[in-house]
Regions:
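Short, polar/acidic, helix-capping and beta-turn segments at strand->helix junctions
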Residues: 1-91
Length: 91
C-alpha cells in the first residue's frame, strides 16, 4: 500500500511493505529500526509466521526488540499482517 489502497500480495511482500512504511515513519521522527524497543505482529494466519519472520529479521539487528506475534480473527481490508512498534526516540 503506497497510495492508501491495498493491493493483494504475498505475506513476504506485505511484511516488506509494512516494514518499509514503518521505516519511513521512524525516519520522519529522526529514528530508525535500532530505536524500536517492542513490536506487536498480528497475522491473519499463524501459518504465515515463518515467512513473515524471515522478512522481519532483515530489518532488525541484535539485540532485536521484544515482540509478541499472534493470530487474529481478521484484519481490516483483508490484509495478512499488521505490525505496531514502540520506539525510544533519540535525544
Amino acid at each position: 500500500m503506497i497510495d492508501g489502497r491495498y493491493e493483494p500480495a504475498t505475506i513476504e511482500e506485505e511484511t516488506r511493505i509494512t516494514l518499509e512504511n514503518i521505516g519511513r515513519i521512524l525516519a520522519s521522527a529522526g529514528a530508525g529500526f535500532d530505536d524500536v524497543v517492542r513490536c506487536g505482529c498480528f497475522l491473519a494466519d499463524i501459518n504465515d509466521f515463518d515467512a513473515m519472520n524471515g522478512v522481519y529479521a532483515g530489518y532488525f539487528t541484535d539485540p532485536r526488540p521484544a515482540r509478541t506475534t499472534v493470530q487474529v480473527a481478521a484484519l481490516p481490508g483483508g490484509i495478512k499482517v499488521e505490525i505496531d512498534c514502540v520506539v525510544l526516540l533519540p535525544k
